[in-house]
Amino acid sequence: MLTLGNLSPQEGSTKQRKRLGRGPGSGHGKTAGRGHKGFKSRSGSGIKPGFEGGQMPLQRRLPKRGFTNIFKKEFSLVALSQLDKFEAGVVVSPAELVEAGMVKKGTLIKILANGEITKAVTVKVDKISSQAKAQIEAAGGTVVLTEVTAAE
């Protein structure tokens, strides 16, 4: 019987680790692949990422650009083709979209006109594109825009 205690990897699927500094017969003895003397042969050596030998590093030569807008609102995008999965006559609110796994809880929601919608649904969202609104209303549905706050 196969249990966690007797699991083993498939034959040939794993390599043995390279044992360095274990005598001349191994082919990796004495200097253990580090060459002779010098900074890089010592333990604890190695330059930091981004160090360019004293030359001004690239991340300091390039200028700083832009800023982060702390008032920016991030929207979760939902396509019309996703809304078509709901039954006709249903009120599609942020809670329903979270339950269906289309958006994460606590995000703002915007509907985009990707795909087609054939069912008449009432949509309650924070934002909607003009084409998406036109398609929903053409299918017999309605659009209710909520105040721009995060979904419960």
From Swiss-Prot:
GO biological process: translation
Keywords associated with the record: Ribonucleoprotein, Ribosomal protein, RNA-binding, rRNA-binding
Biased composition (Basic residues): 31-40
InterPro entries: Ribosomal_uL15, Ribosomal_uL15/eL18, Ribosomal_uL15/eL18_sf, Ribosomal_uL15_bac-type, Ribosomal_uL15_CS
Gene3D superfamilies to which the protein is assigned, alphabetical: 3.100.10.10
Segments forming a coiled coil: none
One cellular component term from this protein's GO annotations in UniProt: cytosolic large ribosomal subunit
GO molecular function, one term: structural constituent of ribosome
Region Disordered, residue ranges: 1-62
Signal peptide region: none
Compositionally skewed regions (Polar residues) per UniProt: 1-13
Family that this chain belongs to: Belongs to the universal ribosomal protein uL15 family.
Known partners and oligomeric status: Part of the 50S ribosomal subunit.
Function: Binds to the 23S rRNA.
Name of the protein: Large ribosomal subunit protein uL15
Species whose genome carries this gene: Desulfotalea psychrophila (strain LSv54 / DSM 12343)
Gene: rplO
